[in-house]
Amino acid sequence: MTSSLLIPTVIENTGRTERAYDIFSMLLNNRIIFLGAAIDDRLANLVVAQLLYLNQQDPEQEISLYIHSPGGNVYAGLAIYDTMQAISNPIATWAVGLTASMGTILLAAGTAGRRIALSHATIHMHPAGGGTQGYTTDVEIQYKELKRMDDLGQAILAKHTGQSVETIAADFERDRWMDAETAKAYGLVDQVSAQSIKAVAEG
């Protein structure tokens, strides 16, 4: 999904015909979405479109969302989050590699019992960032918006982890890094995968 990378093509042979898919389309055909970059408007639009497509194809079958992302734009991430909450499908979320910031919120937002971290995944939480500069009034407006985003992120994480908003707020004061087991104890995921992805996916 990054233009500078060579995207592999997969050939599907049905016995009568052959069809070529790029690897992400092939995954989508198997109800798998891979969020593997910093979250911006473009990536969010792609993920939202895929979620809506899979929901239209089958409103009950599970969707798998694999996340390897340093986070990114909060507004774009919330577009993905709200879509995840709006559709009827159960969504299995997978932490792969690094899942940070907004990526961590999306990880926690998966269907209860179906939030999984691979054994060497790293999960990271931190407050909404961004320097403020300009006229005093502008700085105050920017600060209020950052505070609103922080409060919203904390409320969402409290909802999905079972932690209190106060605990989340305290942990948001500094960067917090977790391994897979720590993330499970915190309530960000339900399982740490010690078996094959196929075995966990089949539940």
Q: Where do the model's predicted regions map?
A:
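N-terminal organellar transit peptides
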Residues: M1-T104, A108-G203
